[in-house]
Amino acid sequence: MEYYNVGKIVNTHGVRGEVRVLATTDFIDERFAKGNTLYLQQSGEPLPLTIESTRQHKGFVLVKFVGYDNINDVEQFRDHELMVSADDQQPLDDGQYYYHQIIGLDVETTDGRHLGKIKEILSPGANDVWVVERPEKRDLLLPVIDEVVKNVDLDKNFVTVELMEGLE
């Protein structure tokens, strides 16, 4: 089964078994809802954890898991990734994609010139930015806006872009 990151446990919170999670998902309310199962990345098979309660606190998501009732139970989870199974992913609207679908795609210009591969996605604010790794050149930062991204073809594993002046 495939798993995808939705957050990282960065610390414990209090003494009653809560953990502080830095969420990396756009679906915080859905992913961290009471009763949902998340999987803890560890060596070997991921550990399934059922959410008992969730609350927001100072930019983090505080999560309590069923059966983990004190700080000693959850201390071992610190610095581990929380994941969701591929079966539990939310359906997206047309034109929306999960990061794992975009990373690794080839990037071509509208005139057919190959630029490189998307290696990372940044989320600095108003729109995402795709980091394109180019052979023997510095990475190219592409804003994910309609004026730049013209087509995403997941079946053929490539993206067509129109470079605005100053991007390259």
Swiss-Prot record:
Which InterPro entries does the UniProt record give?
PRC-brl_dom, PRC_barrel-like_sf, RimM, RimM_N, RimM_N_sf, Transl_B-barrel_sf
> What does the entry list under GO cellular component?
cytoplasm; ribosome
GO-annotated biological processes: ribosomal small subunit biogenesis; rRNA processing
Pfam families assigned to the protein according to its UniProt record, in alphabetical order: PRC (PF05239), RimM (PF01782)
Disulphide bonds annotated for this chain are none
- What is the official name of this protein in its record? Ribosome maturation factor RimM
Domain remark text: The PRC barrel domain binds ribosomal protein uS19.
Can you give the residue ranges of the PRC barrel domain? 94-167
Compartment(s) of residence: Cytoplasm
Entry keyword annotation includes Transport: no
Organism, per UniProt?
Answer: Limosilactobacillus reuteri (strain DSM 20016)
Query: What's the family?
Result: Belongs to the RimM family.
For this protein, the record's HAMAP family field holds: Ribosome_mat_RimM
What keywords are annotated for this sequence in UniProt?
Chaperone, Cytoplasm, Ribosome biogenesis, rRNA processing
Question: Which PANTHER family would you find in this protein's record?
Answer: RIBOSOME MATURATION FACTOR RIMM
Q: What does this protein do?
A: An accessory protein needed during the final step in the assembly of 30S ribosomal subunit, possibly for assembly of the head region. Essential for efficient processing of 16S rRNA. May be needed both before and after RbfA during the maturation of 16S rRNA. It has affinity for free ribosomal 30S subunits but not for 70S ribosomes.
Q: What are the leading ranks of the lineage?
A: Bacteria, Bacillati, Bacillota, Bacilli, Lactobacillales
Q: GO molecular function, one example?
A: ribosome binding
User: Could you describe the subunit structure of this protein?
Assistant: Binds ribosomal protein uS19.
From the record, what ranges are coiled-coil? none
